[in-house]
């Protein structure tokens, strides 16, 4: 719990842009989260501080500050993202119950690392 609090504090600090991207790119194995999926390009895990009954984060293992920085070189990540979302929606039976896939940007983005929220009002 202490490590999670420290990480959230760092995530909102001025060094976060460099630090978060570097950690996901080089140290994702050490991030203390409840993992659901992991590929060469992404990590999906339960949000440590959920805002919804089901709240999953999907984060690239590459420093990408926001959706505005995604390029053609990130096509592999985008394919992994869609396959991961489809797999989780199926596994957690969210199709019938409803879900949303959200990406925040600009002033709505708290952490300067691209990440997607897979959420549902219904527990998984």
Tell what function each PLM region has.
Residues 1-124:
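HIT superfamily nucleotide-processing domains
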